[in-house]
């Protein structure tokens, strides 16, 4: 999981956890994790416009849905319980470790917090927060001086903050996939693309040819291989 992390469970084997008492109904942990990660993202993103608040609000809703299932009510486990118990009769899917479904489904028997999908999720989430922080610093300095943001992450992609939100959400999906967050993810992607296009129209009006040259040389979300050119 998130805040409960590896420390409290590092000494327990997977088999012990499979027989543990149900690890849900922990609403304090659900609220605490939601608050910590939302405030953490807020400290990096610092929304100021209505568009910023929409993108941040959607991201926050994703986190609340995720941690509600991680610690509160395991809706996905209940909906898939018939198939899961038939396929994996030895697994107690109401234990916390079994909620790391990718580790369970791919046969990882050790502590799932050290499993390949969990480690990948840490890399995606950590990388997303680093990208979010560095992009905000560049954007803040550019806005204060009335310039177009083209340095740092903006030298590689035009929308690093939206890309950061996607990386963080993808990391949590890998760590703890749920039906609700899987359904929300493509909707949020579509919303971020729409917000990015609206943002580009506004920035183009403000900076004109300078922005058009920058946009022609810099991808929107996926960086090209190699170093950026003159847009730095």
Predicted segments, located by residue:
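Helix-loop-helix units of permease transmembrane domains in multi-pass membrane transporters
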Residues: 150-156
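Histidine-centered phosphotransfer motif of kinases
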Residues: 156-163
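Membrane-anchoring alpha-helices and their flanking helix-loop junctions
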Residues: 9-150, 163, 168-232
């Amino acid at each position: 999981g998130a805040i409960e992390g590896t420390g409290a469970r590092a000494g327990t084997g997977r088999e012990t956890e499979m027989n543990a008492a149900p690890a849900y109904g922990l609403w304090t942990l659900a609220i605490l994790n939601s608050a910590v990660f939302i405030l953490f993202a807020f400290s990096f993103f610092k929304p100021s416009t209505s568009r910023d608040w929409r993108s941040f609000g959607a991201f926050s809703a994703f986190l609340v849905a995720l941690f509600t299932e991680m610690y509160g009510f395991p809706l996905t486990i209940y909906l898939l319980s018939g198939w899961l118990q038939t396929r994996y009769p030895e697994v107690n899917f109401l234990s916390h470790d079994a909620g790391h479904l990718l580790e369970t489904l791919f046969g990882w028997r050790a502590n799932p917090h050290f499993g390949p999908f969990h480690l990948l999720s840490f890399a995606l989430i950590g990388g997303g927060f680093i990208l979010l922080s560095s992009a905000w610093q560049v954007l803040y300095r550019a806005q204060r001086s009335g310039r177009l943001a083209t340095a740092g992450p903006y030298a590689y992609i035009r929308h690093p903050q939206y890309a950061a939100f996607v990386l963080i959400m993808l990391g949590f999906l890998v760590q703890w996939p749920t039906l609700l967050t899987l359904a929300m993810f493509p909707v949020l992607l579509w919303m971020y693309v729409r917000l990015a296009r609206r943002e580009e129209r506004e920035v183009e009006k403000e900076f004109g040819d300078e922005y058009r040259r920058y946009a022609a040389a810099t991808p929107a979300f996926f960086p090209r291989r190699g170093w950026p050119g003159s847009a730095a």
